[in-house]
């Protein structure tokens, strides 16, 4: 079997995608080595990798496969005892150093797709911009900090505010409960107080649901608390919108209205949930902004990688480990008046990036001894000893249910249905729809996958069938060939500006005053948006949703369902994201083997 047939076989077995296979054939139909390299680069870019180091090939890490049988098949096709991968790349026409357009770029022992190399270059050029040390008024900064924080208190939120004041681009990252929402508000206040002219502020996020969260936190209460009357005249807010709306990206053509030739006229851009942004989108954002625009990216770099391509936030935040430059440390000590700040000094030539990163560590949501905090940290750090406690159900507010048989599967469905008893009771008692929606949002089922017995589609179907059998709901309606009933939850899958509903929003089916079916959504300031079901488009049943769909949302209680097979999608980041969606209680349905294998996969 030659390399072309082998790669096609891998695509048929879904080890790689058809896109990876066709890309490899486009690059070379004869050279097995280049064929393999191009398939690997294409495959790994979708797994969050910006580039592949040459060691990836020297150590036979092809497609991150651990199966030795597959690795041996690849090596057999290559038919060489020793390969000079660098030489093969440098001699092939499809690969260059970036000075001219070629499908692959080989640069400093790293292999890129050209478009990703170009995007990285553009981002790094922006990061190379110097800090604004010369223009900083340290006394004014100190006054601003004292206005926002306790004088005695020293925490990383203070550092985040200072770094925002002295940089035109900054990345603030932190796990759940580390105060990312609060820091957005404090940064806005600090920037207004530090402004020498009227400033135009824009808030944005990757999804409609995330923008809704921003709308909820941005209120006059905060502004009135910290700003003087004159300071309130020093700024204006643009309407909060998604990144696609902000850049004017066409749904049909993907053309971008705002770009390097047509810049956005804003002074400050704050982007939340930045972990969802891929490298190409970040490049587009930076291209559409003047170098005078201050941009703040906020997110959790340990969460799920972007859906489309390479993960840029995680890549950038990895430089935080290099420490701050001496100059930045000196400024931090001077402004905070805290001589005990003793961060690692950057001895590498990377401070142009690391000086622009603040990693928030203290959790305000969880006490350190709470079960959710312990488990999320254990997953992140791969502390497998903690899992012995998990499997014995001796972690507070975390419950592990092993699903190894049909009986245990039925037990899982029963537990989930019982978790919604209060929700159904409030429907029977015809409680206020706001109360019903809030009750539903107390508990959410999360699945890793869409298909199969442990996927969203089947779980939703079997829950509806079981609830109907148990007479939990007894009236069923079929409208536009779809099943409806009072109490049916749905999640919006695409923004609809006309109806005022956004991707990720969850609504509950109920009767209108005219006795017709409608779906109600709880909006800002406890406002209810009622939509007749006949005009609803782009939605799905949401007894269970995917972890991807839940990213950026939080619930009091989560039931997290893992598939019973060791699928490619099962990795540490998706498990970490699922666990950290809950504030109070977590039910995990899985096998011990699958859970541990998932944690150990990056």
Swiss-Prot record:
Gene Ontology biological-process entries: double-strand break repair via homologous recombination
Keyword Hydrolase included in the entry's annotation: yes
One function term, GO molecular function aspect: DNA binding
Keyword Cell division: no
EC annotation from Swiss-Prot or TrEMBL: 5.6.2.3
Top class in the EC scheme: isomerase
Residues bound to ATP: 174-181
A single cellular component GO annotation: exodeoxyribonuclease V complex
Keywords: ATP-binding, DNA damage, DNA repair, DNA-binding, Exonuclease, Helicase, Hydrolase, Isomerase, Nuclease, Nucleotide-binding
Superkingdom, taxonomy of origin: Bacteria
InterPro entries documented for this protein: AAA+_ATPase, Coronavir_polyprotein_1ab, Helicase_ATP-bd, P-loop_NTPase, RecD, RecD_N, RecD_N_sf, UvrD-like_helicase_C
Reactions the enzyme catalyzes: Couples ATP hydrolysis with the unwinding of duplex DNA at the replication fork by translocating in the 5'-3' direction. This creates two antiparallel DNA single strands (ssDNA). The leading ssDNA polymer is the template for DNA polymerase III holoenzyme which synthesizes a continuous strand; ATP + H2O = ADP + phosphate + H(+)
Gene3D superfamilies linked: P-loop containing nucleotide triphosphate hydrolases, RecBCD complex, subunit RecD, N-terminal domain
Subunit structure: Heterotrimer of RecB, RecC and RecD. All subunits contribute to DNA-binding.
Family designation: Belongs to the RecD family.
Function comment: A helicase/nuclease that prepares dsDNA breaks (DSB) for recombinational DNA repair. Binds to DSBs and unwinds DNA via a highly rapid and processive ATP-dependent bidirectional helicase activity. Unwinds dsDNA until it encounters a Chi (crossover hotspot instigator) sequence from the 3' direction. Cuts ssDNA a few nucleotides 3' to the Chi site. The properties and activities of the enzyme are changed at Chi. The Chi-altered holoenzyme produces a long 3'-ssDNA overhang and facilitates RecA-binding to the ssDNA for homologous DNA recombination and repair.
Further comment found in the protein's record: In the RecBCD complex, RecB has a slow 3'-5' helicase, an exonuclease activity and loads RecA onto ssDNA, RecD has a fast 5'-3' helicase activity, while RecC stimulates the ATPase and processivity of the RecB helicase and contributes to recognition of the Chi site.
Name by which UniProt lists this protein: RecBCD enzyme subunit RecD
Gene transcribed to yield this protein: recD
